Amino acid sequence: MRKTLSILAISLPLLVSGYAQASESGVLKAKLAEISTLKANFTQTVTDVNKKEIQKGSGVFALAYPNQFYWHLTEPDESLIVADGRDVWIYNPFAEEVSVMDLNQAINASPIALLVHRDEETWSKYTVTNEEGCFSIAPKSVDAGVESVDVCFDGNTLTQMVLQDQQGNVSQFMLSDQTAISDDELSMFKFTVPDDVDIDDQRLNTVN
């Protein structure tokens, strides 16, 4: 009897924890399901492991379900990330280089891509916790390059994202001027490779 109680004492918290994580994952996915499209301005602040500010920036962020997002950093140095529903294009104008990978590779590189991805098998690779309107998404794999991504809401409005990498650097993105995307703006999710740039094609798989 005492042994049985000991097993229960160990097992019940694990069961409750597993249920809570599943529930919080469901709450986050429900909130994301309310956002079929979104466009916003962002400001970015990057701090190192000692909490020293090492970079500030700004730009435009947009997403559309399914599997489309747009990330245009305009300051201090321009860079562009476009997910067109299947492939993810990363353009560095200064280096005159474009890298392209499939969406599943991008999700493995950063859970931020989960914002527009609803595949249950992919979501099962992450734990989700919720504290005061901020959901923390952490990969279960120890090989992931990102430690966690926090996604914060004010009601159902996405307001902030915080990304922490394995080196302890933290990137905070504050969103403002959030609007839905008009039909005329959907072309932002289509990337055209500029002339005279090098292309690094890393695509491996199809999208789940």
Curated annotation (Swiss-Prot):
<keyword id="KW-0732">Signal</keyword>
<feature type="signal peptide">
    <location>
        <begin position="1"/>
        <end position="22"/>
    </location>
</feature>
<dbReference type="Pfam" id="PF03548">
    <property type="entry name" value="LolA"/>
</dbReference>
<dbReference type="InterPro" id="IPR029046">
    <property type="entry name" value="LolA/LolB/LppX"/>
</dbReference>
<keyword id="KW-0813">Transport</keyword>
<protein>
    <recommendedName>
        <fullName>Outer-membrane lipoprotein carrier protein</fullName>
    </recommendedName>
</protein>
<comment type="subunit">
    <text>Monomer.</text>
</comment>
<dbReference type="GO" id="GO:0042953">
    <property type="term" value="P:lipoprotein transport"/>
</dbReference>
<dbReference type="InterPro" id="IPR018323">
    <property type="entry name" value="OM_lipoprot_carrier_LolA_Pbac"/>
</dbReference>
<dbReference type="GO" id="GO:0044874">
    <property type="term" value="P:lipoprotein localization to outer membrane"/>
</dbReference>
<dbReference type="GO" id="GO:0030288">
    <property type="term" value="C:outer membrane-bounded periplasmic space"/>
</dbReference>
<comment type="function">
    <text>Participates in the translocation of lipoproteins from the inner membrane to the outer membrane. Only forms a complex with a lipoprotein if the residue after the N-terminal Cys is not an aspartate (The Asp acts as a targeting signal to indicate that the lipoprotein should stay in the inner membrane).</text>
</comment>
<keyword id="KW-0574">Periplasm</keyword>
<comment type="similarity">
    <text>Belongs to the LolA family.</text>
</comment>
<keyword id="KW-0653">Protein transport</keyword>
<dbReference type="InterPro" id="IPR004564">
    <property type="entry name" value="OM_lipoprot_carrier_LolA-like"/>
</dbReference>
<keyword id="KW-0143">Chaperone</keyword>
